[in-house]
Amino acid sequence: HCQIEAVELDLLAAQQAQENFKASPWHNRLHLTHQDVQTYCQQTAHQFDLIVANPPYFAQGVECKNDERALARYVQQSHLDWLNWAASCLSEKGKISFVLPYEAGKTLINSTALYCIKQTDVITKIGKDPQRMLLTFSRENLPQVKDSLVIYDENNQYTEAFIALTKAFYLKM
């Protein structure tokens, strides 16, 4: 059985995650460290088979109501730095998956020494350009899989693909 290690910089988000962990049927396999990713990766001896993340990805913009919100939304480090720190914690065959804005994802794919083995372009509505990119990187040069995910159809209803992907996680699906 796998063990899941979460790393969260924001104290309130870490506390909420800890509460959620306690309520989980897998609570004994969930562990949380309140720390930034760079420090965690520099200090840990763990080598992970899979790292899944949603790092902050907005450039500084509209002022947030509080510092916690700004920390969660706005980029503090470059995406390439973040990826490199996480890669230092990867096992030999490990993978890193995360979400980025579409253009930032294209830039990262071209900037890293890791191989992008999966790219899913996320399209909010049929007929629109992709807004986000789900990416998976590996040290191994594996065949790349490219696909897309459309969230809403032309009638503003969730697509079958989106429902199939998220129904286990959304309460009102």
Where are these regions (language model features)?
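SAM/dcSAM-binding transferase cores
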Residues: K128-M173
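Mobile active-site "lid"/loop adjacent to the S-adenosyl-L-methionine
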Residues: P55-D81
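Conserved Class I SAM-dependent methyltransferase catalytic core
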Residues: Q77-P130, L134-T136
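Feature marks short, surface-exposed loop/turn motifs that line or immediately flank catalytic pockets
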Residues: A59, A104, N141
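Conserved SAM/SAH cofactor-binding pocket of Class I
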Residues: H1-G61
